[in-house]
From Swiss-Prot:
GO MF annotation terms: 5'-3' exonuclease activity; 5'-flap endonuclease activity; DNA binding; magnesium ion binding; potassium ion binding
Catalytic EC class: hydrolase
Domain 5'-3' exonuclease: 169-256
Protein name: Flap endonuclease Xni
Protein family membership: Belongs to the Xni family.
Keyword list, A-Z: DNA-binding, Endonuclease, Hydrolase, Magnesium, Metal-binding, Nuclease, Potassium
InterPro entries listed in its UniProt record: 5-3_exonucl_a-hlix_arch_N, 5-3_exonuclease, 5-3_exonuclease_C_sf, DNA_polI_H3TH, FEN, HhH2, PIN-like_dom_sf, Xni
Cofactors required: Mg(2+); K(+)
Originating organism: Pseudoalteromonas translucida (strain TAC 125)
Gene that this sequence comes from: xni
CDD domains: H3TH_53EXO (cd09898), PIN_53EXO (cd09859)
Residues that coordinate or bind Mg(2+): 112
Residue ranges of the region described as Interaction with DNA: 192-197
Length: 257
């Protein structure tokens, strides 16, 4: 059987399931966590079945990654994980492992970079993979071998839905976010450039250099770009997922029994 890799953004799945159960006020904390663990395990089992995976891994975030050191305001406004959930992560990891899925928590890398590295390596070897996450940062990786699945909306993301949502082609998303920024992760983008201007730039120019070389570029946009080029460079690096992480394990070790 040809390998098929399932890549689960673990905290993305867990936090969303937990958020629903946390609203059930008539449950004790213990009951709530038990219910969340069961629902996470059920989700993993369903994903194994629906994707027909032969290999699978659920990746957690390590300690603060290079992005936090590279840009001090990265994710600074994001609400911290509830302590009760943080303390119970060992239970969630055990629940996932019981489904046969390998659990991996790097020392100081984000799950996004680990998953991107795995998907990229698999793709280069003509191995299909499914990334399970609601994180839009994975969308630039969509190709004939890499799919992105939203477990909560029960659908796969595609080129048309991306174009409709962001107003740009999938292959230009990184450039789009470098200009417009990403508020959910406190990535600034270029000061004064919003969604409309970012769409104009990426839909009409192949690069920021191409835009600046066009005499027809508006004086306002030219000024914003030239005065804030440093933030464009920083933002582009922040939104670009790494595919060169040294994993320390091979695809063979992710095979399901």
């Amino acid at each position: 059987m040809k390998p098929h890799l399932l890549l689960i953004d673990a905290l993305n799945l867990i936090r969303r399931i937990y958020a629903v159960d946390a609203n059930q006020k008539h449950h004790s904390d213990e009951q709530m966590l038990k219910a969340s663990c069961a629902r996470v395990a059920h989700a993993c089992s369903k994903l194994l079945s629906s994707t027909k995976a032969t290999h699978a891994i659920a990746v957690f975030d390590g300690d603060k990654s290079w992005r936090y050191h590279f840009y001090k305001d990265y994710k600074h406004s994001r609400a911290p994980m509830p302590q009760i959930l943080k303390d119970a992560l060992v239970q969630f990891k055990a629940a996932i492992e019981e489904t046969g899925i390998v659990v991996f928590e790097p020392i100081n890398d984000e799950a996004d970079d680990i998953i991107a590295t795995l998907a990229n390596k698999a793709s280069h070897n003509n191995i299909s993979s499914v990334i399970v996450s609601t994180d839009k940062g994975f969308l630039p990786f969509l190709n004939e071998h890499i799919a992105v699945y939203d477990y909560f909306k029960k659908h796969y993301l595609d080129q048309d839905s991306i174009k409709q949502r962001f107003g740009v082609e999938q292959k230009k998303l990184v450039e789009f976010w470098a200009f417009a920024g990403d508020k959910t992760n406190d990535i600034p983008g270029v000061k004064g450039i919003g969604t409309k201007s970012a769409q104009l730039l990426v839909n009409n120019y192949s690069s920021v250099e191409d835009a600046l070389n066009d005499d027809a570029l508006s004086a306002s946009l030219r000024k914003k770009l030239t005065e804030n080029m440093d933030m464009y460079v920083i933002s582009k690096q922040l939104v670009s997922l790494r595919t060169d992480i040294n994993l320390g394990f091979s695809l063979k070790q992710l095979r399901l029994n």
